[in-house]
């Protein structure tokens, strides 16, 4: 059972976070703590022990930023579009009403710790302009910097953003609202301005990820004797180094 705990000291209009819906009927255990920081912005701390879940998106224009603390987080939006996060990576999406309405997620290691930042750009910008005009964020610029003409991206968060993500994750349970608001605004400003590194999205393809799962299952169920990496690589027409790279990306070990 996944326990979903809401923490809201803002006193603003009640809000239903987007990502928690997929966990209500998921098989597994763990906790999701949702912290409402200000109108249009909330963060979720996820500590899960499970294999899979299905997420349904309905809120058009919502920006969702996931950061991996520990474990692996794999999401497939279609037969071709797949995301695989390892610690220090982030994934950004903005549901446009067409792409990513449904996604299938897996946790290859059976456990996951992460942070999800959900932003309603219009509500957040309105709140910032009224309450923190000196720290306003241009969400159109943020989306252009992160996504360009795409609806999702993924890759390394980079040292500056990773530091702030981890500060949020570690300090959210203390519920110091002023500190958490400051950190979220800092993160949004960084994401608006830091150029995305070349090589973003250059991770294992969906086919490679599925192959890694297949090979792992083969190794676990093979009862006929020892099979070397060289044999597996040859059988599937890839090099040993490429096979090791796939396992490293998906499971954290070569």
What name fits each language-model region?
Residues 1-19:
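Short Lys/Arg-enriched alpha/beta "domain-start" segment
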Residues 14-113:
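N-terminal functional module of multi-domain proteins
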Residues 41, 60, 64, 175, ...:
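Short, well-structured alpha-helical interface segments that form or flank functional binding sites
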Residues 57, 204-208, 221:
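Residue-level marker of regulatory loop/turn positions in helix-turn-helix DNA-binding domains and
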Residues 76, 83-208, 229-230, 234-240, ...:
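Alpha-helical bundle regulatory/interaction domains
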Residues 212-233, 249-254:
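Terminal helix-turn-helix DNA-binding modules in bacterial transcription factors
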């Amino acid at each position: 059972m996944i326990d979903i705990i809401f923490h809201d000291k803002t006193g603003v209009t009640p809000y239903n976070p987007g990502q928690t819906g997929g966990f209500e009927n998921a098989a597994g255990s763990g906790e999701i703590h949702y912290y409402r920081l200000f109108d249009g912005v909330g963060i979720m701390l996820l500590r899960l022990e499970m294999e899979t879940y299905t997420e349904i998106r309905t809120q058009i224009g919502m920006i969702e930023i996931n950061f991996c603390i520990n474990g692996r987080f794999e999401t497939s939006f279609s037969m071709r579009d797949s995301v695989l996060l390892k610690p220090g990576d982030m994934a950004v999406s903005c549901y446009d009403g067409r792409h990513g309405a449904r996604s299938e997620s897996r946790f290859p290691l059976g456990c996951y710790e992460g942070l999800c930042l959900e932003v309603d750009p219009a509500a957040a910008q309105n709140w910032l302009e009224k309450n923190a005009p000196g720290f306003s964020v241009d969400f159109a610029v943020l989306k252009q910097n992160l996504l360009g003409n795409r609806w999702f991206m993924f890759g390394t968060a980079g040292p500056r953003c990773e530091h702030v993500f981890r500060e949020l994750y570690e300090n959210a349970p203390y519920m110091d609202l002023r500190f958490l608001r400051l950190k979220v605004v800092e993160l949004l400003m960084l994401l608006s301005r830091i150029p995305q590194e070349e090589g973003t999205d250059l991770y294992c393809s969906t086919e490679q990820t599925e192959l890694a799962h297949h090979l792992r299952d083969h190794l676990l169920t093979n009862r006929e004797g020892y099979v070397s990496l060289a044999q597996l690589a040859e059988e599937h027409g890839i090099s040993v180094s490429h096979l090791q790279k796939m396992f490293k990306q998906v499971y954290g070990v070569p």
